[in-house]
């Protein structure tokens, strides 16, 4: 018997059943327990959501930016008031430790919504004189109805990252959460309605890609798609969106990010950063610094520091506040990670720790993989080239700065990069040469609301967060005004 009642679709400010009557199970990855049966949206449900969104968007866009901001700020207050309950639901659905979801997932999502509620009023056009009797002005107008497809690792945070700029700019959004972790997106829809968002302005359609995801990207009345997920799926989404109606797209995709530890680095600081860049959220973070480059002479000292820190990881029940490392999100994903680990062993990487599924006691019921560190890695190894999206750190050695940068850039990805050094001149020199959209110096992982985030190369298109993203949810209208009598040549 599932823990929760059937989860319906959220269309037009209320819960409705899927028209096709199909459902899918959502599982707690720490225990294998079925949490709920969730209704699977289809094309007919999408059409209903689009109709609802179009009606709601007209009402929403007619409000002043001040009025829209007040409603969004009420939603922020409700999110913060319900932080603990939402965090617990997120932990049940994702397997992430409660210590994480309480302090990061809802908190940072609410921060982004608050940011856009504040800057929405700064979305202004320009007035430019052309000559004595003529000028033009520009308007930033909402796109209309936009679609978004979320990932399973940060469900409510990603939903808010996508909804906040879209709604602040006057759009309506149809959001498809990952079918693996859809529960908190539905709660977010409730909160928006309670805060005063007009019906239809934020609809949630759980379901798989075949049943609703493709239909969302192809729908002719959806003006933009924002997608977070893997690069292979991103290519399909982009092709579908462009071939159907030339939709605009924003994509935050995969990564295989480098972390360069410089010869003058504080090795304790570098080890702390490497641990967070690989094992936070059990390694299920797109920006993870999974390729750690360390000077050859410092390899053994650095290995020792990493191994000492692995011993401090508290693996266990995600609902236990002492736990700092939980299961992977699903059995299928666990199997994929384990296959990559076996590939690393077969290709000659030296296993320092981990490398297996954890099955002691209650852990056997969940999808736990031990924190894994490989050393003696080479650039051609599969574990170094491919995104694993799990707790697998690959340690590589280098001899000089130019070599480190060249090898760090030798990837089709370009999402993130980091440098550890006390020398700021060196830090800037290296960062400016690294081909990545998000870079950190002597830190890792923070993405505050005002900071645009997104990738180079095959790690993404466009940006999330920051003022530029608000503008990306608008289209610019240019209007010329002639004050003198128009002179025709005919």
Curated annotation (Swiss-Prot):
Protein name, per record: Betaine aldehyde dehydrogenase
Binding site for NAD(+): 150-152, 176-179, 230-233, 254, 286, 387
Catalytic reactions on record: betaine aldehyde + NAD(+) + H2O = glycine betaine + NADH + 2 H(+)
Enzyme class: oxidoreductase
Sequence similarity: Belongs to the aldehyde dehydrogenase family.
Record-annotated site: Seems to be a necessary countercharge to the potassium cations: 248
InterPro entries given in the database record: Ald_DH/histidinol_DH (IPR016161), Ald_DH_C (IPR016163), Ald_DH_CS_CYS (IPR016160), Ald_DH_CS_GLU (IPR029510), Ald_DH_N (IPR016162), Aldehyde_DH_dom (IPR015590), BADH (IPR011264)
Modified residue annotations for Cysteine sulfenic acid (-SOH): 286
Keywords: Metal-binding, NAD, NADP, Oxidation, Oxidoreductase, Potassium
Swiss-Prot/TrEMBL GO biological process terms: glycine betaine biosynthetic process from choline
Positions with a binding annotation for K(+) 2: 246, 457, 460
EC numbers for this chain: 1.2.1.8
């Amino acid at each position: 018997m599932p823990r929760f009642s059937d989860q319906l679709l959220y269309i037009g400010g209320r819960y409705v059943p899927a028209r096709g009557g199909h459902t899918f199970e959502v599982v707690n990855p720490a225990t294998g327990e079925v949490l709920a049966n969730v209704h699977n949206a289809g094309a007919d449900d999408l059409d209903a959501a689009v109709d609802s969104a179009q009606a709601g968007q007209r009402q929403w866009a007619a409000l002043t930016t001040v009025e829209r901001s007040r409603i969004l700020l009420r939603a922020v207050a409700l999110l913060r008031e319900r932080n603990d309950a939402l965090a617990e639901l997120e932990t049940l659905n994702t397997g992430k430790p409660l210590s994480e979801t309480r302090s990061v997932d809802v908190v940072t999502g609410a921060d982004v919504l608050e940011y856009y509620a504040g800057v929405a009023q700064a979305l202004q056009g320009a007035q430019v004189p052309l000559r004595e009797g003529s000028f033009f002005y520009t308007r930033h107008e909402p796109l209309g109805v936009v679609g978004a497809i979320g990932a399973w690792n940060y469900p409510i945070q990603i939903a808010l990252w996508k909804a906040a700029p879209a709604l602040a700019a006057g759009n309506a959004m149809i959001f498809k959460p990952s079918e693996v972790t859809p529960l908190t997106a539905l709660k977010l829809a409730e909160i928006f309605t309670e805060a005063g968002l007009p019906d239809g302005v934020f609809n949630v359609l759980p379901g798989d890609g075949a049943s609703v995801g493709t239909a969302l990207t192809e729908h002719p009345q959806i003006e933009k798609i924002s997608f977070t997920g893997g690069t292979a799926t991103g290519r399909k989404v982009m092709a579908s969106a462009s071939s159907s109606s030339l939709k605009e797209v924003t994509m935050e995709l995969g990564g295989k990010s480098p972390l360069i530890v410089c010869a003058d680095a504080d090795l304790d600081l570098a080890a702390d950063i490497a641990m967070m860049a690989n094992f936070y959220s059990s390694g299920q973070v797109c920006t993870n610094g999974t390729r750690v480059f360390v000077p050859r002479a410092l390899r053994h000292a650095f290995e020792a520091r990493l191994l000492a820190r692995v011993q401090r990881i508290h693996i266990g029940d995600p609902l236990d506040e002492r736990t700092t490392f939980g299961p992977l999100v699903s059995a299928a994903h666990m199997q994929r990670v384990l296959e990559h680990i076996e590939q690393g062993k077969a290709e000659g990487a030296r296993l320092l720790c981990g490398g297996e599924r954890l099955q002691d006691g209650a852990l056997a019921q969940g999808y736990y993989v031990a924190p894994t560190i490989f050393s003696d890695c080479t650039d051609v190894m599969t574990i170094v080239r491919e995104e694993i999206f799990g707790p697998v750190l690959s340690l590589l050695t280098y001899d000089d700065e130019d070599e480190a940068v060249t090898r760090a850039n030798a990837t089709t990805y370009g999402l993130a990069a980091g440098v550890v050094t006390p020398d700021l001149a060196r830090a800037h020199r290296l960062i400016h040469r690294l081909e990545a959209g998000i870079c950190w110096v002597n830190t890792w992982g923070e993405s505050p609301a005002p900071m645009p985030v997104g990738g180079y190369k095959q790690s993404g298109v466009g940006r999330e967060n920051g003022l530029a993203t608000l503008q990306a949810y608008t289209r610019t209208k240019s209007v010329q005004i002639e004050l003198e009598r128009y002179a025709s040549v005919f």
